[in-house]
C-alpha cells in the first residue's frame, strides 16, 4: 500500500470517527432524556 493511499484511508477513518461518534453519543443521550410515549 502506498503512503498516499494509507493517508487517504486513515483520513476517511478519522473523518468517520469524528462524525459518527459524537452523533451516536448525542442520539443516545437524547433517547435517554426524551421519554415520549411512542406506543400506538
UniProtKB/Swiss-Prot annotation:
Keywords: Membrane, Photosynthesis, Photosystem II, Thylakoid, Transmembrane, Transmembrane helix
InterPro entries: PSII_PsbX (IPR009518), PSII_PsbX_type_1_subfam (IPR023431)
Annotated membrane topology: Single-pass membrane protein
GO biological process: photosynthesis
Membrane-spanning ranges: 8-28
GO cellular component, one term: photosystem II
Kinase keyword on record: no
Residue stretches in coiled coil: none
Localization of this protein: Cellular thylakoid membrane
Gene3D superfamilies: Single helix bin
Reported function: Involved in the binding and/or turnover of quinones at the Q(B) site of photosystem II (PSII). PSII is a light-driven water plastoquinone oxidoreductase, using light energy to abstract electrons from H(2)O, generating a proton gradient subsequently used for ATP formation.
Subunit note: PSII is composed of 1 copy each of membrane proteins PsbA, PsbB, PsbC, PsbD, PsbE, PsbF, PsbH, PsbI, PsbJ, PsbK, PsbL, PsbM, PsbT, PsbX, PsbY, PsbZ, Psb30/Ycf12, peripheral proteins PsbO, CyanoQ (PsbQ), PsbU, PsbV and a large number of cofactors. It forms dimeric complexes.
Family indicated by similarity: Belongs to the PsbX family. Type 1 subfamily.
HAMAP family: PSII_PsbX_1
Name assigned to this protein: Photosystem II reaction center protein X
Protein's organism: Synechococcus sp. (strain WH7803)
Amino acid at each position: 500500500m502506498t503512503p498516499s493511499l494509507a493517508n487517504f484511508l486513515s483520513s476517511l477513518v478519522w473523518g468517520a470517527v469524528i462524525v459518527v461518534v459524537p452523533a451516536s453519543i448525542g442520539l443516545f443521550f437524547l433517547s435517554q432524556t426524551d421519554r415520549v410515549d411512542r406506543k400506538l
